[in-house]
Amino acid sequence: MENAHTKTVEEVLGHFGVNESTGLSLEQVKKLKERWGSNELPAEEGKTLLELVIEQFEDLLVRILLLAACISFVLAWFEEGEETITAFVEPFVILLILVANAIVGVWQERNAENAIEALKEYEPEMGKVYRQDRKSVQRIKAKDIVPGDIVEIAVGDKVPADIRLTSIKSTTLRVDQSILTGESVSVIKHTDPVPDPRAVNQDKKNMLFSGTNIAAGKAMGVVVATGVNTEIGKIRDEMVATEQERTPLQQKLDEFGEQLSKVISLICIAVWIINIGHFNDPVHGGSWIRGAIYYFKIAVALAVAAIPEGLPAVITTCLALGTRRMAKKNAIVRSLPSVETLGCTSVICSDKTGTLTTNQMSVCRMFILDKVDGDTCSLNEFTITGSTYAPIGEVHKDDKPVKCHQYDGLVELATICALCNDSALDYNEAKGVYEKVGEATETALTCLVEKMNVFDTELKGLSKIERANACNSVIKQLMKKEFTLEFSRDRKSMSVYCTPNKPSRTSMSKMFVKGAPEGVIDRCTHIRVGSTKVPMTAGVKQKIMSVIREWGSGSDTLRCLALATHDNPLRREEMHLKDSANFIKYETNLTFVGCVGMLDPPRIEVASSVKLCRQAGIRVIMITGDNKGTAVAICRRIGIFGQEEDVTAKAFTGREFDELNPSAQRDACLNARCFARVEPSHKSKIVEFLQSFDEITAMTGDGVNDAPALKKAEIGIAMGSGTAVAKTASEMVLADDNFSTIVAAVEEGRAIYNNMKQFIRYLISSNVGEVVCIFLTAALGFPEALIPVQLLWVNLVTDGLPATALGFNPPDLDIMNKPPRNPKEPLISGWLFFRYLAIGCYVGAATVGAAAWWFIAADGGPRVSFYQLSHFLQCKEDNPDFEGVDCAIFESPYPMTMALSVLVTIEMCNALNSLSENQSLLRMPPWENIWLVGSICLSMSLHFLILYVEPLPLIFQITPLNVTQWLMVLKISLPVILMDETLKFVARNYLEPGKECVQPAPQSCSLWACTEGVSWPFVLLIVPLVMWVYSTDTNFSDLLWS
């Protein structure tokens, strides 16, 4: 039924043709069941395991690897001789990588689907209905309830469907609907129509929503929606419709894979075409087909060389390390790629309650009457420190601490707060914090009594558990609470009837009253001044109300409660307590004692975090279900708005936002910093608008209602105290529910992205080097310098360790002084592409050069000519060009060992280059990242292992090197550092100056100024080593001459 909240009870019952006392007939139930179906949320049709597995192989990079593995496997099958076993190593290793990758992917996907299933937790199993086949209420399965059923609900029940209340059978009906609306305080319901057809769920006071809990009272109602038509069902549909966006990193890697695949394909085809002339060479037995297959194998080797197989593993490791660091800061990341997405967050949409504020109501101001003279009066105003439930704080008057027992009015005010109260404080030893037991408002009054300590109770030496209610206990020992007149909507107050524990002639029974100021003060005939009772005049009443209005609408927007007493109440026997309509008669002729103002205070650390966000170019938007006045007041206190800033067109209620046309709504999302009184659908709409501006949005939420928006936002952030649905729909969970934790996570995300850029570029330049190496050997006609199994070893192991260690690079000091990076910014810019291409070309040329050195110039080598080396395939005994040359030397393991050793050593030097994008090694020495130094040592140790420990040299087709050969390796490898230092210098001084927020002061050109910040220990270590390496003779010049 549409808009049931706007209809009267009679209209709703008439719509379903049902009587409240008898319920539906079985015939009606059958028809309605056929029309509306079962009252349950349909199970999510998840993808089958096979579909999920196939999905993992849709990535282009993965498909290329798979193709390379299949071709390698086929070629290995037809391999002959000693290489048969080693030929199978390559396809098996690639397949293992792909299987591991698929397992991780499937596991992550499975987790994502659990969010919708978690909604079913909120479906009750049973419901109590009235139907015509029985004369009394009957319990049936909740899924059998249909629209039109008359349902009975009582305290502790879970509401089985969306229900329009028809009658309330207790004084009040309180409902905890926090899972749906995010409201932390239980809501008082009534049966009157709510005329507004566009009312938000918070304002539908005559409706009960499926999945919410009854906190107090008993009532009856008619079911108006079941299953997917309920509010919780609409949330489920929205979640099903929400497609998970790929993170910026995933998009970047997809683009990179696409570019790489095109480049690889072109190079492979080019290598094959270049060598068409060699297909008939004698070494292939003169068979064109065998020649074609041989060069096809080289092209496959090239594909393996070009693909950074270690990249998925290194990225996963880096993100996992990042999540561990974040977990220490109370940010628990559920989805690995979202760690990096945090780094480009440009908007944070945050809930108010519990995230920007403490979610711990606290009294911060109060007043009592000081003097009254006719229509004029003066007030004693006090402020109270402390913003949590901890009973620690002081009462101040004119910024000076006061002793509350010196004011009679404060003693009586504390007595009312302690006795007219059903809540208490409790110390949670496990968490080490004070918590509320009961309602938030009443707990704030309990905490105030502890801070006031009006009877000067000795508190020293008490344990924290005893301290929690020490002062309240003293007051409760003086008077005994006989009964309570519960809160009701008509009088907006509650009261307790108390009698003295030690009866005497002077001490009599009293009623203590608290409630909304306008309701209570209208029923006050007197006011308390000190210990005397003075008649209330119109002037005094006006003065009191003007102060309360100022508190309620000023910069604090406090929630005010008036406190009063009835000094001579009727005796209990004279009261008719069964009918709550009589309660207002007994709460008249009251004496006004004072007023307290409370609020949910902002967290102390939030203001500095909001300031940090502003510095970092991140817009903070508060989105709350609270009213606009309170929301704007909190925004001013934490710095989202300035103290005097005009909030026109910057703060909207959900209703105001809906009334705007689409163009104005876009503008609102572009400029606004506060949305109040919103529904979940508004959150999703705001996220959509922000995404249309290419903003990367982080959205916080804790209720079931927040799940669709959490799923839609790039970064969904659930509260640690939130619902299971919110947590499963989100990418990150805040263990401490604290806004400042989000800002710390954003900072960590930026640092992780910077480090990731470094190791991705490091791995790419390594792969470029390998491609150039294979391309050069093919183009020059040299023997193979590197074989696939060696390339796999380098890509996965020796490169993988330093790449992972680059994830530990220290973050830049000014990381939060820069605006968020553009998510569309390429991973590798034009200049960086040139830079790493240049480095890669050197790596490839040096690797080929090392192999050529052994053939042409090494003392223990064959010393063949360049022509003989480049035409080695024509080597035969009867060829005059190869007279005196043993053709077997072209299959020697030494040149491969030289090439592999140079490749590994250059990569270690390259890892040092990647310590910083543009900072020189002279200013940022290797020990800035001790993990990197350790990983380089480990990688070199592993290289020595495969060189010198049998039978590994046989598997990798290499052989041990002597000292001279190692010196040559160092001579060829070290120039890569000088080369990158030159490129960094160009970038620093000519291409990328001015990217910093703060421009450096101009420096003088003195020698001291130029060497400032240089790490002299590094200089003293490296210079003698380089001089020694290049002073030894290794026939390096012979290679260059040839």
Swiss-Prot record:
UniProt cross-references to PROSITE patterns, sorted A to Z: ATPASE_E1_E2
Superkingdom of source: Eukaryota
Enzyme class: translocase
Residues the entry annotates as binding Mg(2+): D351, T353, D702
Chain ranges on the Lumenal side, renumbered to this chain: 70-89, 274-295, 777-786, 851-896, 949-963
Organism: Oryctolagus cuniculus
Alphabetic keyword roster: ATP-binding, Calcium, Calcium transport, Disulfide bond, Endoplasmic reticulum, Ion transport, Magnesium, Membrane, Metal-binding, Nitration, Nucleotide-binding, Phosphoprotein, Sarcoplasmic reticulum, Translocase, Transmembrane, Transmembrane helix, Transport
Residues covered by region (Interaction with HAX1): 575-594
Bilayer disposition of the protein: Multi-pass membrane protein
Modified residues (Phosphothreonine): T441
Classification of source organism: Eukaryota, Metazoa, Chordata, Craniata, Vertebrata
Disulphides: C875-C887
Key word Ion transport present: yes
Database matches in Pfam families: Cation_ATPase, Cation_ATPase_C, Cation_ATPase_N, E1-E2_ATPase, Hydrolase
Catalytic activity: Ca(2+)(in) + ATP + H2O = Ca(2+)(out) + ADP + phosphate + H(+)
Alphabetized NCBIfam families for the sequence: ATPase-IIA1_Ca (TIGR01116), ATPase_P-type (TIGR01494)
Gene: ATP2A2
Amino-acid positions noted as binding Ca(2+) 2 in the UniProt annotation, renumbered to this chain: N767, E770, T798, D799, E907
Keyword Calcium belongs to the record: yes
Residues bearing the modification 3'-nitrotyrosine: Y294, Y295
Activity regulation summary: Has different conformational states with differential Ca2+ affinity. The E1 conformational state (active form) shows high Ca(2+) affinity, while the E2 state exhibits low Ca(2+) affinity. Binding of ATP allosterically increases its affinity for subsequent binding of Ca2+. Reversibly inhibited by phospholamban (PLN) at low calcium concentrations. PLN inhibits ATP2A2 Ca(2+) affinity by disrupting its allosteric activation by ATP. Inhibited by sarcolipin (SLN) and myoregulin (MRLN). The inhibition is blocked by VMP1.
Domain notes: Ca(2+) and ATP binding cause major rearrangements of the cytoplasmic and transmembrane domains. According to the E1-E2 model, Ca(2+) binding to the cytosolic domain of the pump in the high-affinity E1 conformation is followed by the ATP-dependent phosphorylation of the active site Asp, giving rise to E1P. A conformational change of the phosphoenzyme gives rise to the low-affinity E2P state that exposes the Ca(2+) ions to the lumenal side and promotes Ca(2+) release. Dephosphorylation of the active site Asp mediates the subsequent return to the E1 conformation.
Record protein name field: Sarcoplasmic/endoplasmic reticulum calcium ATPase 2
